[in-house]
Amino acid sequence: MPKLLTSLLIAALLAPAATAQAGWSSEIVSPTGEQGRLVYVSDAEGNRVPEFSRAGYGGGGVPLPDVPTVETVGPAEGDDTASIQAALDAVAARAPDANGIRGAVELAAGTYNVSGTLRLRESGVVLRGAGDGEDPATDTILRRSGENQEPVVLVGRPEASQGAAIIRRDGGRRTATIRDEVVEIGAVSFDVDDADLYAAGDEIVVFHPATIGWINAVDGGGTASDARWAVGDMPIAYARTLLSVEGPTVTLDAPLYARLVRSVSPSYIYLRNRTDVIEDVGVEALRIDIETQSSSDESQARNAVVLTLVENGWVRGVTALHFWHAGVSVQNSRYVTVEDSRALEPHSLVTGERRYNFEVVQSQLILFQGNEASDARHAYVGNGETLDSGIVFLDNTSRDASTSSEAHRRWGQGFLFDNHVEIGSRGTGSSDRRIHLGNRGDFGTGHGWSCANCVVWNAQMNGALVVVEKPPTAQNYAIGVQGTASNRGPFLSTTAPYIEGTNRSGLEPRSLYLRQVRDRQLPVANEGDGVGRLRLLPPRPNPSSGATQFGFELASRAEARLAIYDVLGREVALAVEGPFGAGRHTATLPEGALAPGLYLARLSVGAISRAAPFTVLR
């Protein structure tokens, strides 16, 4: 059973028993709502614990798919790079099925010499081994030798991923300015000018410029002796899908992790360019062993696995050894899960820009679950400044780290360290911190306030230190830490973070993320339209040259109708109609059902509807 599904089932089964025990709940996040939903309390500034449930594959709470094998490769004498790549290319050339899946390349147990980089460049392709253990009789071992510093496995199209590719603009439509004076943390809806320029299903960016007003509000970035942050350099931006447009109000598929104040920085939305994004790609059950000359060598592969410009991707059951930067690096990506994987024994000097075992860079809504890091500097880290947000680290372990897991620099937002376990602490001074949510001053290149609206929840620190500090205009939280939680970082000692329940066992819920996923998936009662949450997922693939699949979610049982309209507003096809229970459903239009052109899928339940555009190719 997939790991996330297992965790959700365990959480659901344990919930009644846990409620009956003598546990405790936070004063600002408590399961006291209807059906045990979490209730959040905001402070006087409007800060509150964020909602993280959309992190991970499929937007959170969705099991990873089991992709069928369509190509099999065994080890051979000499270099195996070409034979594995040929199999990957053969699968990439296949037509995707209705779910966008092409198939998996399965590497039989054995040792493979890989001098080059294995590249997954098309959607729906998976690279899978037999296991990530040490025994070539039962496991798949990729051995990289030589001085090639390129990644061993590269998922995505790096030539299209330069700069801030996750928020690349499509110039086809004008921007729409956000009207609200304040958009609160956790908001999914707000009003905009020119809302009629946009439609349900559009991929957009919510853009908050780094104005002089904002930089002043955050104390110039809190950079100590380094220069203040510069106007225009660090926009806060969120890649989102529009679920609905009703009058001036737009509704997003995931919440925001910063408070947008119009008088400080007028924010706006624009259409996102998703060219070269690939989806439904994964790396599974492999051991990547990078050979080096010594434990301080840096001539070998910088990273073991890199995902770049990927959505709805995953890394599962992979062990990476002896990289010098990252075992898994997720870059310019969204809705990715990395689970049950290990990034161990990096070989490098122990200094800056090295040993970031599990890393995100300019990525959003990413879930790391059940992983293990060893000998890191920054074991679990965000390295993409203001473009990192909605990053969840759940049930992970760090052994023998030399410094902290953290959002590393320049206003990463919405990081959650949920049931983190630290082993092998080297001290409890401010320089020995093992999780840090706060100010990094003049470390690096003016790192300053590295983290805003971030949470440590129920961490088991085993003698290591959590440092949490309050940034201007935001808050950071340490709730239920088993260990030492301090508000005194390496640069400041006078901030007022939220620290609660240190060394108090029995925090409920055990996992903030899993409870938030559960809450989101519960039926929504007493909405005026009687429907509750109604969501139409983006059609896939889009554009389509074959079958097109539509997904939708209902919060409660309802009569639903999914129809297809042409550009003249005429109904040209009916995908599905009838009663459906609560949950996620799919419908498929077969190849040839529609002529080439632009169409609109509209899901209707009573008087409420959601729509998404899609294109059919020849």
Indicate residue ranges for each PLM-predicted region.
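Positively charged n-region of N-terminal signal peptides that target proteins for export
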Residues: M1-L4, R618
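Extracellular "leader-to-stem" segments immediately downstream of a signal peptide or signal-anchor
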Residues: T6, A11, P16-S294, N476-Q521
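Glycine-rich beta-solenoid repeat tracts in large extracellular/virion proteins
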Residues: T117-R121, E134-R169, D191, L271-D276, ...
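C-terminal outer-membrane/trafficking sorting elements
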Residues: D529-R540, S544-R618
